[in-house]
Regions:
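Sec/Tat-exported extracytoplasmic proteins
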Residues: 13, 32-36, 52, 56, ...
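Active-site-adjacent substructure of cysteine-protease-like catalytic cores
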Residues: 41-93
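Generic structural signal for short, flexible, solvent-exposed coil/loop and linker residues
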Residues: 26-28, 37, 47-49, 67, ...
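Detector for Asparagine
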Residues: 11-12, 17, 33, 71, ...
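Short linear motifs in intrinsically disordered
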Residues: 17-21, 48-50, 79, 113
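Stable alpha-helical elements in mature extracytoplasmic
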Residues: 5, 24-31, 44-48, 74, ...
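Cysteine-nucleophile protease catalytic domains, especially the papain-like/related folds used
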Residues: 1-40, 119-127
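Noncatalytic regulatory segments and standalone regulatory/sensor domains
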Residues: 81-127
Length: 127
């Protein structure tokens, strides 16, 4: 459950943003590792596509665009790759979740916020 993941981050790190809801890239990586998964920060679009083609889910910190309005960032999970598109799971919206999106659009809307990218990038392969 998302609440259990949030609790893991909140109880074990200082990376939980309780004022604006959410966590940093460091918090996400902590949770991935705490649940027994390995992680790889993806720094190029080619790496992102390769991870998705190999069947690995990807944690994605995104900026303004499809998933979040101006002056904010948001986290989604990407999975699968077909015909230049990937499926997004959005914990904040039943409208945007479960749909396929152009990989170029996702890449171009990646977060550049240091809170999200202090781990080296905005995308993290899980597993």
């Amino acid at each position: 459950l998302p609440t259990a993941v949030a609790g893991t981050i909140y109880n074990n790190t200082s990376e939980m943003n309780v004022k604006a809801l959410g966590t940093s890239g460091k918090g996400a990586v902590y949770a991935i590792n705490a649940y027994g998964y390995k992680h790889t920060v993806l720094t190029t679009k080619a790496q992102l596509i390769s991870a998705l083609q190999s069947g690995k889910p990807v944690f994605a910190a995104v900026g303004p665009g499809i998933f979040i309005g101006p002056n904010a960032t948001h986290a989604i999970i990407l999975s699968g790759y077909s015909n230049g598109k990937t499926k997004a799971m959005d914990p904040a919206s039943s409208y945007t979740t479960g749909k396929w999106y152009d990989i170029n659009t996702i890449w171009n809307q990646r977060s550049t916020d240091p809170y999200d990218t202090s781990i080296g990038g905005a995308f993290v392969q899980i597993g």
